UniProtKB/Swiss-Prot annotation:
Cellular component aspect of the GO annotation: toxin-antitoxin complex
Assembly: Homodimer, probably forms a complex with cognate antitoxin AF_2432.
Coiled-coil residues: none
InterPro entries attached to this UniProt entry: HepT-like (IPR008201), HepT-like_sf (IPR037038), Type_VII_TA_RNase (IPR052379)
Lineage: Archaea, Methanobacteriati, Methanobacteriota, Archaeoglobi, Archaeoglobales
Top-level taxon in the UniProt lineage: Archaea
A Pfam family annotated for this UniProt entry: HepT-like
KW Ribosomal protein (keyword) present: no
PTM description: Modified by cognate antitoxin AF_2432; probably at least 2 successive AMPylation events occur on Tyr-97.
Active site annotation, chain numbering: 90, 95
Record's protein name: Putative RNase AF_2433
GO molecular function, one term: nucleotide binding
Length: 132
């Protein structure tokens, strides 16, 4: 398995999430929060695809990959639904950036952080079982 690549992506997510300030005051800070959320979620979706492939599944779209991880018992229903919502937020940030509800996104930061950190923990558990 490509353990190093997983660990690089995990490290990126943890670092990007830790750089998000508790309060944002300026437009550039808001943009930074949006970017770090977007790229953290994207990295989590990359990890999902990598896991699906490395566990013998067929890689599809992000939502299907998350669903496959649920079916394989890697993540539970609650985490799967949370990751799908995160991916929806990522898509919204990418495709509707100029019309994004800033307050809605900022109010979801802590929830997204918690979900991604929970996902990382599950991935680390799986990696430990596969490649101790």
């Amino acid at each position: 398995m490509r353990r190093e690549r997983y660990l690089e992506k995990i490290e990126y997510i943890v670092e990007a999430l830790s750089e998000i300030p508790e309060r944002v005051k300026t437009p550039i800070e808001v943009s930074g929060v949006f970017y770090n959320l977007l790229t953290s979620i994207e990295s989590a979706m990359d990890i999902s695809a990598m896991l699906v492939k490395d566990l013998g599944g067929r890689v599809e779209d992000d939502y299907s990959n998350v669903e496959m991880l649920k079916e394989l018992g890697i993540i539970d229903e609650e985490l799967a639904e949370g990751l799908k919502k995160c991916n929806g937020l990522r898509n919204w940030l990418v495709h509707r950036y100029n019309r994004v509800d800033k307050e809605l996104v900022l109010s979801s930061v802590e929830e997204v952080k918690a979900l991604l950190l929970k996902f990382i923990q599950r991935v680390e558990d799986v990696l430990e079982k596969i490649e101790p």
